[in-house]
């Protein structure tokens, strides 16, 4: 079954993904990949014993390139026809492709016509022709603010008939966010890259809310 981006591409539209998560995370992956299980995001995670949640009986062995499948999520991102993909997850692209230990997934993306960018300033000079793959952090993009003294958000608790609220805490600027693109900056760059009379489909995800 074709996904929405494949249908848009077939209709002549430009296609793009912008996310503050890894570009291999579940939401962006659903627009770019066909896979049995969301955690089969790299070639070495395709078999049940290597999957992040081994208690699940699901395996993606049948999706491996070596078995005639389309490959892991990251391999499918690298071989996709997307015009622009911006987010995090650069570490996923350092692994080698299934069946070819001499080629990394990042190199595979370049072979497929992607220009890989990594820095905020690169958004101001996107190539006019090549596909663009922006990988601005090793995993999910850092959030803009963090709790003072390492404070983390806590769940609301319930004791009997009473709701127990966690203690509020102050936030401060997150130094890890320095040099990172905002969701707005990535979205603006993607629209600028895709804008044409043919039209485009762009999926934009503010993913950080469920990563903290």
Feature map (PLM): residue ranges:
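A structural signal for short secondary-structure junctions
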Residues: 127, 195-196
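Membrane-embedded translocation segments of transport machinery
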Residues: 170-173, 189-193, 211-212
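Short acidic, glycine-rich surface-loop motifs adjacent to enzyme active sites
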Residues: 197-212
């Amino acid at each position: 079954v074709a996904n929405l981006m494949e249908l848009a591409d077939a209709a002549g539209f430009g296609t793009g993904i912008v996310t503050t998560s890894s570009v291999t995370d579940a939401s962006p992956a659903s627009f770019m990949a066909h896979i049995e299980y969301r955690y089969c995001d790299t070639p070495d995670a395709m078999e049940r014993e290597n999957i992040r949640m081994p208690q699940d009986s699901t395996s993606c062995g049948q999706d491996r390139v070596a078995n005639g499948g389309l490959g892991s999520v990251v391999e499918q991102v690298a071989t996709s026809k997307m015009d622009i993909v911006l987010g995090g997850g650069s570490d996923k692209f350092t692994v080698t492709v299934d069946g070819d230990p001499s080629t990394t997934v990042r190199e595979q993306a370049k072979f497929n016509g992607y220009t890989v960018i990594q820095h905020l300033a690169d958004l101001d000079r996107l190539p006019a022709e090549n596909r663009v793959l922006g990988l601005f952090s090793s995993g999910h993009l850092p959030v803009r603010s963090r709790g003072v003294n390492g404070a983390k958000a806590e769940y609301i608790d319930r004791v009997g008939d009473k709701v127990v609220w966690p203690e509020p805490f102050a936030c401060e600027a997150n130094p890890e966010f320095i040099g990172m693109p905002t969701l707005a900056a990535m979205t603006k760059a993607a629209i600028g890259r895709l804008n044409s009379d043919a039209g485009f489909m762009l999926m934009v995800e503010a993913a950080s809310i469920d990563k903290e």
